């Protein structure tokens, strides 16, 4: 852009912000209940607001081109398609979850707990920064972050920390199971307390490595999980979860603030740290508008389906450095945020991505229709999967890309087990019960 944004640019970005406010009002017009869909739409309103701010920042607007109407329209349609399962559940909320009667669901939770506690000694001894250092040393967060970036640049070809891999792969699904267990009448309180501690560890460990992104992702996952099951939790459990959530947010906020200051305080231009924070939160909508639909080529699934492609084609890039080098002809890469929609558009093109979104979410809508006033756990898992994609990727990129394709595999296995187990119960009621 090189200069202040034009009136048209501001009309478009403000219009995009207002359409999400209108969507939020429409979403709650008939049914006032706040749920997971409310959280996702609310986050999109926030991101659009910060897009307005960073677009008009005299330091950052030189990074942007002038905005166009069609990309914003396309982005809105794609995000609404991705949200369609949550919207359907909002207006067709069953009052009861059918219990799958499976003790097997404890297995991934136990694996998460074990892997979480195995990581603690390594994280503490191997970290460049302790929690105290992050708060007191202005350079500690930056040093830890640079160390992690160096490690990631060489990652993708081998497993260096098996407990961390297991933990990260299981985190989203076990968060889902944690909130489901809270809805049951007979609760193992000690088990739930230990599982909660393991989930909280998932927010602490990235802080020690100077990472904000992983903490934010974990927090958004917890918010989605709680909001999805909130309707089925007792008033007392809701209160306890809300108090625990506020406490977690306070504990995490201090080191995250310190990391942010450490990362951006030495950079010139803009309004200090705040300008970089606004750019960090608000850039995705603008970069999507500028380049995601017309980047000068596509990546053929090398990011969104990276691990699956590597099983078939050995020349598939193993990490983001290799991928950026391979597709250096594109106008934009994954150094910048373009939302999860942008990731798919860059991988497959806007037309193919539309059909991928439409067909997948149509299948989900067909599958999640509740019957007899109850909803099954595998149906809720599908909705949770789509919500995590929407919530985690609304500000950044597709969160299940690269080696995180393994998380999709875990989702599939859990979904298949829940469906198979229920079918077995119907066919052999006594043999299937655990």
What are these model-predicted stretches?
Residues 1-105, 109, 114, 195, ...:
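N-terminal "leader" segments that precede or initiate the main folded domain
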Residues 2-11, 91-232, 254-263:
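Membrane-embedded catalytic interface detector for glycan/lipid assembly enzymes
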Residues 30-37, 179-194, 368-380:
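Membrane-interface helix-loop-helix junctions at transmembrane boundaries of multi-pass membrane enzymes
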Residues 333-342, 346-434:
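Hydrophobic alpha-helical segments
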